[in-house]
Amino acid sequence: MTTRSSKKAYANVGTSTNYSAQTANKSNKSKKQTNVVTNNNVQVNKKAWRHFKRSGNEVSFNVARSRIVRERHDRNWWHRHYSRITFYGGGYWYWNAGWWYPAWGYNPYYNNYIYNGPIFGYGYASPFDVTAQVQRALAQQGYYYGPIDGVLGPGTRSAIQRYQIDHGLAVTAAIDEQTLYRLGLA
């Protein structure tokens, strides 16, 4: 006659807790970025920032980036296709689906674009105003040390990238809807 022990098996809860604590900030290696620290302590509620769609913002940053018109056109073409065009940072920008894009060729004398990607917009704020507000918010939180000049230059993009990494956002180094929401600007 064999007797079996009727001891209850308990999971080792301490081990799983220690394991997740050890791996929470583990470094990931990638071909493009040599050392990116993943911050698993921050949770982003995607439903919380989808309210931008109500204000005319219809697409994500990746879709906006793919919609940039890369051909040069004269100002008549730009005005026939887009109703809102503004001068910003040495060049002209057009508004489309909640994003500001560089309008190459609008005026050949003003085609100096420091940044050539989309800038998320809200309401009727110009790209200059949006960028200046982001610079001001990043400076208040210790991420940006340059002048509040409304230019999305390398210093501003670097500060945005550090902020996005520290807050668990998608790292785009650009002004996008999630970053504006987390900064409390929209």
Give the label of every model feature segment:
Residues 1-97:
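Intrinsically disordered, low-complexity segments enriched in Gly/Tyr/His/Pro and basic residues
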Residues 64-147:
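Long, low-complexity, proline- and polar/charged-enriched segments
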Residues 97, 152, 175:
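Single, functionally critical "micro-switch" positions that shape active/binding sites
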Residues 127-172, 183:
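A short amphipathic alpha-helical interaction element
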Residues 173-179:
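Short glycine/proline-centered loop/turn elements that form peptide/ligand docking sites
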Residues 186:
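Extracytoplasmic/periplasmic copper-protein system
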